[in-house]
Amino acid sequence: MAARNRSNPLALAVLICLAERPMHPYEVATTLRQRQKHESVRLNYGSLYGVVESLERRGLIAAQETRREGRLPERTVYRLTDTGRIEVHDWLTELISTPVRDYPAFEAALSFLPALPPDQVVTLLHERAQRLEVELAQAAATRELAQKAGLPRVIWVEHEFDAVLREAELGYVRTLIRDIESGGLDGLQWWREIHDTADDEPGSLPLPTRDARPDERKE
């Protein structure tokens, strides 16, 4: 049985393309781009060929034929194996049913928010909010085009999910901006004071922790 290695969504995308029909890697990439799947799965040709080689080693796909079209280099066409078909079902079932702990870069930045002065953070959050607004407007335009083209919702549901996440993020960013600007954010005074201290004592800026409340860490 093929060893399980389900860390790369691009591998799943390749398997699902081959579940439709045998393809060569370039055709897989073209299909994914035509269907806008590269917006949900990180795609570049270098990594794609590495993924294809890995899937073949694991017995999930197999070379069906090698062919040449005109002056183009030879291309190997791959097909999905029976083991690969089972893997598609099991992998997709796992992804849909089981939440996985991701580590978003913005969440990491929030965890170290006090390392920057509050006023600078507010400026940066305003910039982020503006970018999110632009992205949401673009996403709405894309959805409108899809609807006008008569594409069923199930075809672009991942874009809908992405928009919901971005709307939630934008709402949170706006709330955080408001709480900082109004002075209502718990710990804001401590946050300002550590930067005042850092100006006088270089190297004195502490890493934020959850061991104590801000007023306890000042002592």
Which stretches of residues belong to each language-model region?
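Alpha-helical transition-metal enzyme core signature, strongest for iron centers
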Residues: 25-28, 55, 132, 163-173
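Amphipathic alpha-helical dimerization/coiled-coil segments
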Residues: 89-137
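Long, compositionally biased intrinsically disordered regions
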Residues: 153, 160, 168-172, 178-219
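Amphipathic alpha-helical coiled-coil segments and their boundaries
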Residues: 118, 125, 152-155, 159, ...
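Non-transmembrane amphipathic alpha-helical segments
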Residues: 125, 132-143, 166, 173
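Acidic interhelical loop/turn segments
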Residues: 140-161
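Basic helix-turn-helix/winged-helix DNA-binding cores
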Residues: 1-101
